[in-house]
């Protein structure tokens, strides 16, 4: 497989990663099927638990193989298998730097329980002492309550890192992408 810089590879994830050179990837983002029983057009999302976990271990090992020593691996997953996939990732050798909750407003409508309106985003690295995080990049900083609300002089004038609960609403993103000039 020809893996050019800044390209998206399309195909079976394990086969596609097996075609990549070992240690050639800076960032891997996985949003695998949640295995919650939905029947999609091209995929039946209802494997037996053990089969799903074995498949997950297979593709997580493939991620580990292609990731550079200082690379980053993000995993987006629902509630059903979040804990299991975190443990599998750690058993393979990944270190969890952050467990982020992504809150969204388009959750599945439920009639017998509270509506689920979040997903889990795990931030993994291979080496807890050698990884890229860009915490000094001002674009990654947000104002703090210490600064905005309390006018506390101890606040970092450059802001602070965001919380581990992210509110991302697709409507907000679309609004930012469409300008008044686009008509």
Regions found by a protein language model. Give the residues of each.
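Core catalytic lobe of class I
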Residues: 1-183
